[in-house]
Amino acid sequence: MSTDPTSKPAFPITDEVRHALAVTKRGVDELLIEEEFAQKLAKSAATDKPLRIKLGLDPTAPDIHLGHTVVLNKMRQLQDLGHTVIFLIGDFTSLIGDPSGRNATRPPLTREQIESNAKTYFEQAALVLDRAKTEIRYNSEWSMPLGADGMIKLASRYTVARMLEREDFTKRFQGGIPISIHEFLYPLMQGYDSVALNADLELGGTDQKFNLLVGRELQKQYGQEQQCILTMPLLEGLDGVEKMSKSKGNYVGISEKPTDMFGKLMSISDVLMWRYFELLSFRSLDEIARFRGEAEGGRNPRDFKVMLAQEIVARFHSQADAERALEDFNHRAKGGVPDDIPAVTLAGAPLAIGQLLKQAGLVPSTSEALRNIEQGGVKIDGATVSDKALKVDAGEFVVQVGKRRFARVTLTA
């Protein structure tokens, strides 16, 4: 028995606790500190008091993609274990701009942009989380009332030297790239959120580790039990190289049409498919391992890619939508034209092919249109277009760009 008067009683690590710990650790990058978190789980089980699990997201864009759902899936698993999930919308911290992973100052958003983005954020997140078991908070609740006096007192709790331990700040400092003072406030304000919420566990991407540790340190200074931190891997985009990002065009939005979502998922490499299974699928690890063994034994990996795509489409739409998306995909793979393509009427024949593709909404720019023609990705009524200077005469025809973009065009003089 410990003679340390500050030591905490140890709670028994039961099979229930071991199961909860295994669920928590699935697919994570790092859990700090695992022994502490096991004790938090054990205490929760013994006292029947749920843990407070925090996830903060700044509404920097209106749409959520599959990359965001990696951490949301983990939150849902923790909800299903009976814990309280706090979905924190960073309406105050968005005004500062998160510098994590940046090599230059991130421009802060306006309050109007933040409010507009925040409207759709939780509605999309609720496609993953259990709405009835989710506590929604805004960090302006406690950050705005701090005022200048409170902000200065908070800033006194951390040093510039500690801030410069963060890799992205260090690189910018050593490279002579400016770091604005307000950027140092971001980790502090995120950390103060944990104090305000008395969080037991905070989740984030691997690029958030420093900020999460600041929260742990501030809780100690405020006399609270320190939160554990759990970092989730950053999901690679469809290219399998860079992290999924709307700005890079390698993303799958959770509000996309079922056919588009299905087609994008079927386009990933066989190697990336297993990564998506691990981070996005709700199937057991044993089942995924069995699938992998069957693929290595000669079964077509496409079979498993279809399972993955259908599971994800069904989650965000419905099982019926997933079945229809598979039918549509197979139809297109055989050279067929989908039934639900948009009809577009254009004028100005004869019209340059680049302009036609742009005006039909099939490409964002004429330069993108010409790139697709160079790559053999443009078809009119099934015939590949190779002439970038083509002028298209008046008529009605089906135009295709890539595997998934179609339009039924009526072109007049």
Curated annotation (Swiss-Prot):
SMART domains cross-referenced by the UniProt entry: S4
Motif ('KMSKS' region): 243-247
EC primary class: ligase
EC number of this enzyme: 6.1.1.1
Motif 'HIGH' region location, chain numbering: 59-68
Alphabetized UniProt keyword annotations: Aminoacyl-tRNA synthetase, ATP-binding, Cytoplasm, Ligase, Nucleotide-binding, Protein biosynthesis, RNA-binding
All copies of domain S4 RNA-binding, residue ranges: 351-411
Recorded catalytic activity of this chain's protein: tRNA(Tyr) + L-tyrosine + ATP = L-tyrosyl-tRNA(Tyr) + AMP + diphosphate + H(+)
Sample GO molecular function, one term: ATP binding
Pfam families, A to Z: S4, tRNA-synt_1b
Subcellular location: Cytoplasm
GO cellular component terms given for this protein: cytosol
InterPro entries in alphabetical order: aa-tRNA-synth_I_CS (IPR001412), aa-tRNA-synth_Ic (IPR002305), Rossmann-like_a/b/a_fold (IPR014729), S4_RNA-bd (IPR002942), S4_RNA-bd_sf (IPR036986), Tyr-tRNA-ligase (IPR002307), Tyr-tRNA-ligase_bac-type (IPR024088), Tyr-tRNA-ligase_bac_2 (IPR024108)
Gene3D superfamilies per record: HUPs, RNA-binding S4 domain, Tyrosyl-Transfer RNA Synthetase
One GO BP: tyrosyl-tRNA aminoacylation
Sites where the protein binds ATP: 246
Keyword presence, Electron transport: no
Protein biosynthesis as UniProt keyword: yes
Subunit structure: Homodimer.
HAMAP family in alphabetical order: Tyr_tRNA_synth_type2 (MF_02007)
Record family assignment: Belongs to the class-I aminoacyl-tRNA synthetase family. TyrS type 2 subfamily.
Function: Catalyzes the attachment of tyrosine to tRNA(Tyr) in a two-step reaction: tyrosine is first activated by ATP to form Tyr-AMP and then transferred to the acceptor end of tRNA(Tyr).
The protein's name in its UniProt record: Tyrosine--tRNA ligase
